[in-house]
Amino acid sequence: MLNINDINKRIKQRPPFQMIERVIDWTPGESATGIKNVCINEPYFMGHFPDAPIMPGVLIIESCAQLCSLVFDTEGGNPDIIYVLLKVDNFKFVKPVIPGDQLVITVTKTKIMGPLAVFDAVVKVNDEIRSKGTMTFTMVEKSKIYG
């Protein structure tokens, strides 16, 4: 549904920190399902852990966050707005993610409270849940951060 070029028009992250490579389902303002292919060439595997590489949990959360920002962005990639992760709740890592896995990440908006949006996230590999949790975001104008 969205390829890497389409995604680049809507989210701020870029390689090597861009985690979402393809979006296979997307309802703007509501939900999305995206793909992250986990490759042994990712720089973090050099140190986490060399003898038994595992994708760091914080990067799994970041993958979910990037997909949430795509859902939250209903303005079509406004260059003056940054979507900021404020809070992570009850994120559980059920089984490790290793090189060769393909993450299928689904995020669903569950609540809007003024400028805040709450999302549920589920990460699967081969239809098996690897992690899940809840995330809260807000929109911030770049000028309020950088002047």
Identify the role of each PLM range:
Residues 14-15, 113:
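Short loop/turn motifs at secondary-structure junctions and domain boundaries
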Residues 29, 98-101, 108-147:
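HotDog/MaoC-like acyl-thioester-processing domains
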Residues 15-55:
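Catalytic strand-loop segment that frames the active site of acyl-thioester-processing enzymes
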Residues 8, 51, 93-95:
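Beta-strand-rich interaction surfaces with strong enrichment in secreted/lumenal proteins
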Residues 2-14:
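Short aromatic-glycine motifs in intrinsically disordered, low-complexity regions
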